[in-house]
């Protein structure tokens, strides 16, 4: 059974979006290497008027998606051991390590919130993991769900042409990726670094490692500190400051 992503949403028409194009889309539509399902939670309203939400307990602005509606939608599915994810700005940050963990499951079930969010009781009762794709607030969880789904399915066997490329990306070993270049050799008076044209693969690997360390230290000090701690725990020497090339 291919990796299956099921999305609980008020707006199933938002999908597949970018999931339907390029290699990800081909793997879904033509190769059946992964599957996408959407479930319209509006179909599970218990209100004669079709309402899915109610006012927040304790007062306040906005509306909250009702627990019984979400529970009914979820209970209509066969989970098959798939993790339950709720897209939320207050959730734990999305990381490549978590993506790799989820990608090993039969699939994922993703709940997209709206308004002020979802009644906390259904999240607790059903064991949802709250996931954030960044420190910003969106109108709903659909765009964030697509990010999580794409991150997972691109790791499914056969989806990408070269699986080794996923091992050299940002975050795979705690560091950000090195800069990339291609022809032409000179662009607006900027040249490709000479080491990349040297044919000396040892020097190229050393340069790329230095650039990864430099980029991580400058742009993500949190990742850099975690990387240093991990290296020290392994007994590896502390990386030095990357040299200019």
From Swiss-Prot:
Positions bound to S-adenosyl-L-methionine: 113
Gene Ontology biological process terms from the UniProt entry: tRNA N1-guanine methylation
Pfam families: tRNA_m1G_MT (PF01746)
Catalysed reactions, as listed in the record: guanosine(37) in tRNA + S-adenosyl-L-methionine = N(1)-methylguanosine(37) in tRNA + S-adenosyl-L-homocysteine + H(+)
Catalytic activity, EC: 2.1.1.228
Keywords assigned: Cytoplasm, Methyltransferase, S-adenosyl-L-methionine, Transferase, tRNA processing
GO cellular component: cytosol
PANTHER family reported for this sequence: TRNA (GUANINE-N(1)-)-METHYLTRANSFERASE
Subunit structure and binding partners: Homodimer.
Protein name as catalogued: tRNA (guanine-N(1)-)-methyltransferase
Species this chain originates from: Caulobacter vibrioides (strain ATCC 19089 / CIP 103742 / CB 15)
């Amino acid at each position: 059974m291919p990796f299956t992503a099921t999305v609980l949403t008020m707006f199933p028409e938002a999908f597949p979006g970018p999931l339907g194009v390029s290699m990800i889309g081909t793997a879904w539509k033509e190769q059946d290497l992964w599957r996408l399902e959407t479930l319209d939670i509006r179909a599970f309203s218990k209100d004669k008027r079709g309402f899915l939400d109610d006012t927040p307990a304790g007062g306040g602005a906005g509306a909250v998606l009702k627990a019984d509606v979400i529970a009914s939608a979820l209970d209509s599915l066969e989970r098959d051991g798939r993790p339950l994810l709720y897209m939320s700005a207050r959730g734990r940050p999305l990381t490549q390590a978590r993506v790799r963990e989820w990608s090993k499951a039969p699939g994922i079930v993703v709940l997209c919130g709206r308004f002020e969010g979802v009644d906390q009781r259904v999240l607790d009762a059903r064991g949802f993991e709250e996931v954030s794709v960044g420190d910003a607030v969106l109108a709903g969880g659909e765009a964030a769900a697509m990010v999580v789904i794409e991150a997972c399915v691109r790791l499914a066997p056969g989806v990408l042409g070269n699986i080794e490329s996923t091992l050299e990306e940002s975050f795979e070993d705690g560091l950000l990726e090195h800069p990339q270049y291609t022809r032409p050799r000179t662009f607006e008076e900027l040249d490709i670094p000479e080491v990349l044209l040297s044919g000396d693969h040892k020097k190229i690997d050393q340069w790329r490692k230095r650039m990864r360390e430099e980029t991580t230290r400058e742009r993500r000090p949190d990742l850099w500190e975690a990387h240093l701690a991990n290296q020290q725990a392994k007994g590896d020497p502390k990386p030095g400051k990357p040299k200019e090339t």
